[in-house]
Amino acid sequence: MKGVFTVAEKVVLAYSGGLDTSIIIPWLKETYGYEVIAVAVDVGQGEELEPLEEKAIKSGASKIYILDKKKEFVEEYIWPTLKAGAVYEGKYLLGTSFARPLIAKCLVEVAAQEGATAVAHGATGKGNDQVRFELGVKALNPQLKVIAPWRIWNIRSREEAMDYAAARGIPVPVTKDRPYSMDRNLWHLSHEGGDLEDPWNAPGDDLYLIITPPEQAPDKPTYVTIDFEKGIPVAVDGEKLDAVALVEKLNDLAAANGVGIVDIVENRLVGMKSRGVYETPGGTILYTAHRELEYLTLDRMTMHFKEMVAAKYAELVYDGNWFSPLKKALDAFVDSTQETVTGTVRLKLYKGSCTPAGVKSPYSIYNEDLVTFGAGGDYDHKDATGFINLFGLPLKVRALMEQKTGLR
């Protein structure tokens, strides 16, 4: 009917300006007729954000939100994970994993503000990020439709994606000669794809964009002290810093000394293994320091149980269950353990290594008088006899039974 104007539905796209999200804008318009609203969440990408506004509009977005969430990222996502001591499969400090729920939260908020009916992301059908984005959206607004182009379109490789972009005049920061997929934020820089897909290939020094290769780091060690209050880092070398500035300063210190390179073949949630090389300089320092302070301030039972919690916490974060009831419950436990994790840790940084070089706390339960090998002290060696007799009683009873019945 003449004179009828149909307003296009809106979709909010998690936009990075990289290859995947760059071609998704025209694809959403061509495929669904959506008005595309791009959202870039600033979690410390740095200069990568500068060209995004112009690029998003040229790619066909009606508008773009660039949201500065660095402070929230550190205080509400990094610090809880650090306090938990969560490390996935013994190596991965979860830099991408805990950024995704924050981005999902921002998508949901902008969708509500714009009256959008859908959100979209550029995660592939082979990766973990699709799960992390979509679980976050489901937890925060289950009414929103989620569009995942990589699970729908006919593009099957990065080379095809680059051809699609070239045909539409969309510049992307990837070449067929160096097709690495990278994700950068305040916490880390990840590298995947290309020659890294063969785990026999060692990463070349030219791969690293943040960290100085250890062999090229200074020949003299650097010492740094970090102050913690209830498990949260608050100062570097005695200087009080806000959360973002603190991470940035430690990134610079660690990177200059070659600290924070992790090369891992990890088990993805979706069932396959993948190889990633991560640059996590400041994070490596903070995890080392935080753990050292816990050695001094946590009792044996709490520390051992917390190690199990840390493994589960890491799995929850890695799997995209940031907003789950279990994670909330684990946060309550972790916070209770951090009441006495206050003190100062000194670390030695040298050619890729990060070594504890001193720790002190007003809440230390290390008692020098008890453990001293010197004369005196508060410990009576005779007390050990009764303890050993009782502690070893089950073993003694079992051995007597085996002797009596002929089992041994």
UniProtKB/Swiss-Prot annotation:
Binding partners and assembly: Homotetramer.
Swiss-Prot/TrEMBL GO biological process terms: argininosuccinate metabolic process; L-arginine biosynthetic process; urea cycle
Keywords for this protein: Amino-acid biosynthesis, Arginine biosynthesis, ATP-binding, Cytoplasm, Ligase, Nucleotide-binding
UniProt: L-aspartate binding residues: 124, 128-129
Top EC class, one word: ligase
Residue numbers binding ATP: 14-22, 122
SUPFAM superfamilies hit by this protein: Adenine nucleotide alpha hydrolases-like (SSF52402), Argininosuccinate synthetase, C-terminal domain (SSF69864)
Gene field: argG
InterPro entries: Arginosuc_syn_C, Arginosuc_syn_N, Arginosuc_synth, Arginosuc_synth_CS, Arginosuc_synth_type_1_subfam, AS_cat/multimer_dom_body, Rossmann-like_a/b/a_fold
Main location: cytoplasm
Name used for this protein in its record: Argininosuccinate synthase
Residues binding L-citrulline: 92, 97, 128, 132, 181, 190, 266, 278
Biological source species: Moorella thermoacetica (strain ATCC 39073 / JCM 9320)
Keyword Cytoplasm: yes
Catalytic activity reported: L-citrulline + L-aspartate + ATP = 2-(N(omega)-L-arginino)succinate + AMP + diphosphate + H(+)
Protein family membership: Belongs to the argininosuccinate synthase family. Type 1 subfamily.
Pfam families: Arginosuc_syn_C, Arginosuc_synth
GO molecular function: argininosuccinate synthase activity; ATP binding
